[in-house]
Amino acid sequence: MMGLGYALTEEVRFKDGEVLDRNFDSYQIPRFSWLPKIETVLIDNPDTPAQGCGEPPIVTMGAVIANAIYDAVGARLLQLPMTPARIQAALKRG
């Protein structure tokens, strides 16, 4: 979810050094309703030390979604979040 937000919706905007988004009223974060049903399977392996499993996939989310957009419509996006307006602009640039 966190990586999805970084890639698609979350952005703090600035103008002339001033923060335009000063509260969370307009800061859109992903909703659970956006996701398909996820089944979590935990595997007990006492020989393996405990470690985090949620953080590493966050790093790849932007690239994964950018490449999916490129494969779907041929628009190469290099800035996050990847909004519909940025996709349209990339399509116009060719």
Regions found by a protein language model. Give the residues of each.
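C-terminal catalytic domains of large/alpha subunits in multi-subunit enzymes
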Residues: 1-94
